[in-house]
Amino acid sequence: MATSGVEKSSKKKTEKKLAAREEAKLLAGFMGVMNNMRKQRTLCDVILTVQERKIPAHRVVLAAASHFFNLMFTTNMLESKSFEVELKDAEPDIIEQLVEFAYTARISVNSNNVQSLLDAANQYQIEPVKKMCVDFLKEQVDASNCLGISVLAECLDCPELKATADDFIHQHFTEVYKTDEFLQLDVKRVTHLLSQDTLTVRAEDQVYDAAVRWLKYDEPNRQPFMVDILAKVRFPLISKNFLSKTVQAEPLIQDNPECLKMVISGMRYHLLSPEDREELAGGTRPRRKKHDYRIALFGGSQPQSCRYFNPKDYSWTDIRCPFEKRRDAACVFWDNVVYILGGSQLFPIKRMDCYNVVKDSWYSKLGPPTPRDSLAACAAEGKIYTSGGSEVGNSALYLFECYDTRTESWHTKPSMLTQRCSHGMVEANGLIYVCGGSLGNNVSGRVLSSCEVYDPATETWTELCSMIEPRKNHGLVFVKDKIFAVGGQNGLGGLDNVEYYDIKLNEWKMVSPMPWRGVTVKCAAVGSVIYVLAGFQGVGRLGHILEYNTETDKWIANSKVRAFPVTSCLICVVDTCGANEETLET
């Protein structure tokens, strides 16, 4: 039987691998023999003197492993003719290990020797050892050592290591500035660090706290640097309350006229109109925001049942919920506040309940001008948009309204192209997308597949490609340029199918179905994962949470984590960074 081309190719690859292994084995054997000769001082032509230790070697081996020794032995340097070469300012054990590496290509890098090895490998230009040390240190970076590693990397010209350390410093600044390493930094490094836009903080008052901590650590000697250090704090970004109660009361500030001017300037900023604020640069440029995303679920028809779901550890945390129950309401999150609006309890509810996740406080505002249930809502650029819905059992509405969180005022916007209720709505890239729903909450209300998009800049609606499956009471989430419609129900019953809208292509595509069929689906996305946390099947509720990875198109039914018990709940993603930790305890 003739051998196929594929079999021949596979055979050749196998033969090459075996030959390469044999070559490596032979080379290791040769180098092992040479290393034994070195230890026995056989044919050695150079002695490295480190302090009082004598280390024999062969020039050719050292020259092959180290560019430093290559230049030393192949040029007209004095050492090229000397049998004994003295290495000053070197550690005997470290040089011994480097020489051993030249013969064996093996070396042990650990926390006790990594700094000395990196220093020596850098000095004697032994790149493989330098890389091993850099890789080791990159894995060891944490809040307690990142500043020191950054300084070391800068001194030894290791840009890759420095980038890793600096990125860690910026991402974990709120932990780093509380360490001893930070307090012992020199003024130049502190000034540079506090000026970075990429510092990840909950709010600018944390940068202020870092600056004051550093100054007070050695106040007599750091007094001359006070203005330079505090000038890096962006006072206009600090809340008016913190400026007046904490910053102004700080003795360091009170005793320094220049620093006091900075604080007053920050307070004046809060009195400016939004237009005037935009004209200011530098001092009002925001830092990189620190986030702690959780999914908030509010009981709706059972208001006493409200919780956070933490996707990091799959934990549930209770939320204090004093608001009255509402059926078929909506909720959105913007700037630390969850807005619960619409819904009904015998009659439409006019009030909008608001929950500040940072302060753990509830209060009320005037709700939409047209009270209704089965509406959809989303937030964009400081505005909350509500669409459609029905006025307790009536037909669906075309209505589209907007609440400005800055002016606390409601405005009616151009109506949707299609009347709808029990639909989904999301913000994506500054535009508002509305998908599915039905023409009414009664049995005869036709389920819709139509979709449309609203542009706040032009205040116009545009019809989009319809969904493959008509659906209402579905989940609708935005993940990386795709809008996912999850489950829900059509005219025949509950759905397990899932489809996504490709914004760039204006088309819908089906993906893997859920391992559960839901008449109503309550889901939200954090990162690239969609979490289905509650839902109703028609005869029972969802028992355990479901996870969908949008990158792998895989569903997981997490049997260890119970789903939220209220199927009529409201759901939204919130950022709890800065919230009182006591309110987040399970």
UniProtKB/Swiss-Prot annotation:
Residues 146-248 form the BACK domain. GO terms for biological process: protein ubiquitination. InterPro entries: BACK, BTB-kelch_protein, BTB/POZ_dom, BTB/POZ_KLHL7, Kelch-typ_b-propeller, Kelch_1, KLHL7_BACK, SKP1/BTB/POZ_sf. SMART domains: BACK, BTB, Kelch. GO terms for cellular component: Cul3-RING ubiquitin ligase complex; cytosol; nucleolus; nucleoplasm; perinuclear region of cytoplasm; plasma membrane. Substrate-specific adapter of a BCR (BTB-CUL3-RBX1) E3 ubiquitin ligase complex. The BCR(KLHL7) complex acts by mediating ubiquitination and subsequent degradation of substrate proteins. Probably mediates 'Lys-48'-linked ubiquitination. This is Kelch-like protein 7. The lineage of its organism: Eukaryota, Metazoa, Chordata, Craniata, Vertebrata. The gene is Klhl7.
